[in-house]
Amino acid sequence: SGKSTLANVIAGRPGYEITEGQVRLGDIRLNQLEPETRAHHGVFLAFQYPTEIPGVSNMEFLKADVDSHRAEQNLEELSTVEFMRLARAAAEQLDLTPEFLKRGVNEGFSGGEKKRNEILQMLLLEPKLAILDETDSGLDIDALQTVARGVNEFSNHDNCIVLVTHYQRLLDYIEPNYVHVMVDGKIALTGDKKLALELESNGYGWITDT
């Protein structure tokens, strides 16, 4: 327990209060920053249950998001043509068609499409810290492999990804550097992929019993 709470606290979602400690990204103290400011500093949260935004096309939403981030970094706004080229290339990596970009944000999307749309946003924003909150939940094997491909494409030495999951199966396609087990809101155990495999076989009881 506490995994999604941790993700939401780092991202600065309303409804949570930090009573002790600090949240830092590099040299930046995030505690008192608004969610939008944290996002501009490179924090990205892929929601467990992405919401619909009727009347706003995916392309409009994504370009506005990217433009906002570039403005905060004093970078020139991308032309519509240049952005469309980048968006279509990123969508293709996730097996999404150009027509997908014209649809309303998450409007009528399947569960798998919503999750892939979150990964699409991550690829375009290129955050320093991406938190994926149960992105694998409810996905069939094909969608899971596609999402994993997008995560692997994004991962490099200049960023960090926190994957929140209950299951080991995502790690069949993504090689983690560390596996942390949270119990009652605290990290109870840390290991590598072998730890995830052990949890899949033996459950969590042996951790709470020690």
Task: Spell out what each predicted region is.
Residues 158-166:
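Conserved H-loop
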Residues 41, 51-128:
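ABC-family P-loop ATPase nucleotide-binding domains
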Residues 144-157:
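Helical segment within the ABC ATPase nucleotide-binding domain
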Residues 22-38, 106:
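ABC ATPase NBD Q-loop/coupling interface
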Residues 173, 182, 186-209:
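Conserved beta-strand-loop-alpha-helix hinge in the C-terminal portion
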